[in-house]
Amino acid sequence: MTNAYISGTGFHVPPDVVTNDDLIRRFGVDTTHEWIVQRTGIEQRRFAEAGVGTSDMALEAARSALAQAGLRPQDLDLIDFATLSPAHAFPCSGAYLQRKHGP
């Protein structure tokens, strides 16, 4: 591989939207939506269902990227996959993604 380029991009977000007010109720925290937004800029976030890991979400994103690029998994030389919330310390989430996506 002499040149690398981005053929397609994809993303996946879990369907469960959790607002700051939801968090406050869920965890009984003594704060407000405004306090959280003022300090973090975050108004809502997405939570994955139990048992859904980053490699599962990455698989959906990879499928979208491949469809956008008109490619098949076997056409790829490399998938660049980074996460701050891996499901496992070892092996890396990319190894799980590769296994789920196939050769």
What spans do the regions from the language model cover?
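Short Gly/Thr/Asp-enriched flexible loops that form oxyanion-binding sites at enzyme active sites
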Residues: 85, 89-99
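Conserved "HGTGT" condensation-loop signature of ketosynthase/thiolase-family condensing enzymes
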Residues: 1-80, 99-102
